[in-house]
Amino acid sequence: MGKIKYTPMRIVYHLKYLYLRCKEKRKVKNLGLGLYGKHAKLALPTVISNPSHVFLHDYTRIHGQSIIYNYTGKFIMKEYSGASIELLVVTGNHRPTVGIPHYMLPLSRINDKETDIIVEEDVWIGARVTLLAGAHIGRGAVIGASSLVNKDVPPYAVAVGSPTRIVAS
């Protein structure tokens, strides 16, 4: 059998890869997340509006190009759960005030309501999924790509669509 040849280009590639991985881990730890568990991975670029309200438990993974809009609501992802690219999390919602245009109200009078989003253990979330305020995804559930989760998903269910509907449990 032939030996694997380590050409200078291959060595440079691996060194660059290792450097970028270490640099990425340092950046994530400096974000000030509420919890960043052991072996958790938050791939960059990811936009988080309030990092102190994001809780990633052990062995969780969120791939890059994700956006988490959370001002007072919390986003909690428990052990062994993962999300593919372009996850969109929105913990806030606002109710319109009848008779008064929204843009005319001062910020203190806007009827915003933020609710926590909880992803239980061992959940798979596909690419381009949107999680809206109050969503609770049960243990072992699978969320299909491009789904809109606006209600609770029971444990060990497969949910797809916009809005999500249960196709298997």
For each feature predicted by the language model, list its residue ranges.
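Hydrophobic, membrane-inserted alpha-helices
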Residues: A40-L42, I62
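C-terminal/domain-terminus segments
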Residues: G134-T164
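Flexible, glycine/small-residue-enriched loop-and-beta-strand segment within the central core
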Residues: V47-L56, R61-A135, S162
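Short, conserved clusters of charged catalytic residues that mark active-site
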Residues: K23, T72, G144
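Terminal amphipathic alpha-helical/low-complexity segments used for targeting or macromolecular assembly
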Residues: M1-L33, G37-H39, Y80, E86, ...
